[in-house]
Every structure is written in C-alpha cells, then in structure tokens.
C-alpha cells in the first residue's frame, strides 16, 4: 500500500478539491465495458483536482492507470435489509486494501450493520488488520464523527448527512455539522451536496482537511436537472 503518512496526505489535498468520479449501474455514464470513469478523472486532474474519490475495484484499477493523484476508495454493495452500503463489511475493505490506495472510506453511521458489529468494533478490526491504511469515516451526524475518531479513524467525512433517517434534510451542504466537527478538532473531509464553488469556499474557511465534490462536477444528468428545475 502507498506509504503515505496522514500528514503528507493532508499537505497534498490542502486547500483543494477532491473530485468524486462514480457511475452506478442505473446511471447514464455507467458502462459494462468500463473506460468512462478514467476520462472523468483525467478531466478533473486537468482542471486542478488534488484527489479522486472512486467506487469499485474495476474503476479504481482503471483510474490508477491514468493518474497519480491520491485516491479515496469505496465499494458500494447492498446488504439488505440493512441500510449501510458503502464499504459495509470487511470483505469490501479487503478488496480495497489490495489496490494500494491512499484512503479507504467506510460507512460509520450508527445504523444496524450486516455483520452485526458496532461501528467502533468494526473500525478497530480494520485498524488491526491494516494498521498502515488511512481510513475515512462516512458519517451523518456529529456523534458518529466523534465515535469514529475515538475508534481510531483518520478522517471524518460528512458524506451521509441527509441520507440517514435521523440527519437533517437540506438541499446543500450540512454547514453546521462541518463547522462543529472542525471546531471539535476533528480532521474533516467535507462531502455531500456541495453544489457551488461558493459553498466550497465557505467550507474551506471552517478549517477542513479536504473537500469532496461529486455530482456538481461529474454527474451531467444531475447538473442538467438543476438547470431545468431553476427555470420552472
């Protein structure tokens, strides 16, 4: 795995934009053959991105062929009836750990998990198995972020705010959560519903370690829908 320290990664992504480049099977940019996501990555890098967030072993392997930017990797896999689906079990962690990526992100919400573990126990198991791997917690509320840090997580993402039944539903970033975590001394990677450059700039002022933007850059269907809706 990349022997990059947390400090070195923080320096690399400081004051920049990490671009999430993903397409799920039901989305227009998804193809069985692959090849589309690396093009998005190349465009993001040429535009000045400092990192990439990506989903699936296939996409990450293809991405690594076109860029040296640091990668936050996830595997989205459903485990019904449980809700967590972002790197939800050790199986996904194992698959990602083989890819030599800088950061592995995992669902760190308090929701019931497929493996039956409390999230802090799962984090401890991952840290024990992969002690040199940097980890990012995808969370939805303040308490989840603190619990993840306590268990040894490196970065806390606000990725899932608005996507759990108990977190605020707003059409935009959860500024309050991001600021509260930063004020508590947490190493935050802000993510989720960051639609505009102005929002990203405001978030940067809170003292986050990194900012992930996805849909507003790499989901043309979603971007088109926003323009269309604004005219109605």
UniProtKB/Swiss-Prot annotation:
UniProt EC number: 5.1.3.9
Known pathway: Amino-sugar metabolism; N-acetylneuraminate degradation; D-fructose 6-phosphate from N-acetylneuraminate: step 3/5
Keywords: Carbohydrate metabolism, Isomerase
Listed CDD domains: NanE
A GO CC term attached to the entry: cytosol
Record-stated family: Belongs to the NanE family.
Known function: Converts N-acetylmannosamine-6-phosphate (ManNAc-6-P) to N-acetylglucosamine-6-phosphate (GlcNAc-6-P).
Protein name (Swiss-Prot/TrEMBL): Putative N-acetylmannosamine-6-phosphate 2-epimerase 2
Gene: nanE2
């Amino acid at each position: 795995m990349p022997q990059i320290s947390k400090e070195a990664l923080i320096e690399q992504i400081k004051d920049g934009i990490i671009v999430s480049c993903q397409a799920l099977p039901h989305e227009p940019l998804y193809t069985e053959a692959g090849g589309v996501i690396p093009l998005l990555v190349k465009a993001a890098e040429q535009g000045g991105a400092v990192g990439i967030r990506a989903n699936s072993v296939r996409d990450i392997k293809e991405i690594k062929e076109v860029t040296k930017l640091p990668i936050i990797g996830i595997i989205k896999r459903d485990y019904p009836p449980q809700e967590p689906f972002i790197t939800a079990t050790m199986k996904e962690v194992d698959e990602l750990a083989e890819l030599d990526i800088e950061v592995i992100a995992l669902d760190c919400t308090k929701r019931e998990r497929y493996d039956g573990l409390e999230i802090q126990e799962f984090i401890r198991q991952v840290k024990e198995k992969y002690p040199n791997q940097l980890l990012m917690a995808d969370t939805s509320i303040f308490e989840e972020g603190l619990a993840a840090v306590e268990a040894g997580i490196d970065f806390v993402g606000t990725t899932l705010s608005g996507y759990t039944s108990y977190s605020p539903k707003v059409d935009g970033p959860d500024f309050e959560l991001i600021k509260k975590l930063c004020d508590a001394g947490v190493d935050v990677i802000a993510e989720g519903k960051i639609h505009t450059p102005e929002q990203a700039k405001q978030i940067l002022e809170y003292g986050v370690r990194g900012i992930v933007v996805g849909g507003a850059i790499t989901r043309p269907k979603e971007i088109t829908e926003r323009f269309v809706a604004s005219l109605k």
